[in-house]
A protein has these predicted regions:
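Conserved beta-strand positions in repeat-built beta-propeller and related beta-rich domains
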Residues: 1, 37-46, 93-100, 149-155, ...
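A short loop-to-beta-strand structural motif that recurs across blades of beta-propeller domains
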Residues: 1, 60-63, 104-106, 157-159
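Asp-box/WD-like beta-propeller blade repeats and closely related beta-sheet repeat scaffolds
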Residues: 2-53, 59
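Short loop/turn segments immediately following beta-strands, especially the blade-tip
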Residues: 3-6, 107-115
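Short coil turn/linker residues within repeat-based beta-strand modules
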Residues: 6-9, 67-70, 112, 164-167
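Beta-propeller fold detector
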Residues: 10-16, 73-76, 116-124, 169-171
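Beta-rich, blade/repeat-based domains predominating
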Residues: 19-37, 56-61, 73-95, 125-155
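A detector of repeated loop/turn-to-beta-strand junctions in beta-rich toroidal repeat architectures
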Residues: 56-60, 102-104, 116
Length: 171
């Protein structure tokens, strides 16, 4: 992490490993109000992705870096976890899966300790892609507004969803 007001090539590693194994390539992140950091770890930074001989973790995970420096595995049910954000009340975690054959966004209800209960598909962009074949791009970064609407980059632009997962439109 480098301060933006005086950027320089000095970085502090907050977390580099899970259970003694180096992360694949941490990607997107979201802080909660406690100062804990949720982040995704797809294989995009590895030259050969899942087949890279330097790969140490054999899955792509979603993690929580606690304030005490401990890393907890939140989930490993996505092939390409990418964009990540929290609902305004921080009771729901949203994660984009940018895997071509299964392009979905999932929502996870969070327990009091910040860990996820079983997730559910929030929006599957497979049918959306079929209806709009000219709209290129995959599920990626996202943010939530004060009303809980999710603004997510995806096929053809920024898709806007209600908190219930209804597609409101695309910019």
């Amino acid at each position: 992490i480098a301060p933006t007001e005086s950027p320089r090539a000095e970085y502090e590693t907050l977390a580099g490993k899970y259970q003694g194994k180096r992360f694949n390539s941490p990607n997107d992140l979201a802080y909660n109000q406690k100062g804990e950091l949720y982040f995704t770890d797809p294989p995009y930074g590895l030259v050969q992705k899942e087949k890279d001989p330097k790969r140490e973790i054999d899955f792509q995970g979603v993690y929580l870096l606690r304030k005490n420096g401990q890393v907890a595995l939140v989930g490993k049910d996505l092939e390409r976890p990418n964009g990540i954000t929290l609902s305004p009340d921080e009771k729901t975690l949203y994660v984009a899966n940018s895997h071509g054959p299964r392009p979905i966004w999932k929502s996870y209800e969070l327990k009091e300790n910040g860990m996820a209960k079983k997730g559910k598909v929030f929006f599957d962009s497979t049918e959306y892609r079929k209806k709009h074949p000219g709209r290129k791009g995959g599920n990626d970064g996202m943010k939530v507004d004060v009303d809980g609407n999710i603004w997510a980059t995806g096929p053809g632009g920024v898709l806007v969803f209600s908190p219930q997962g209804k597609h409101l439109g695309t910019i």
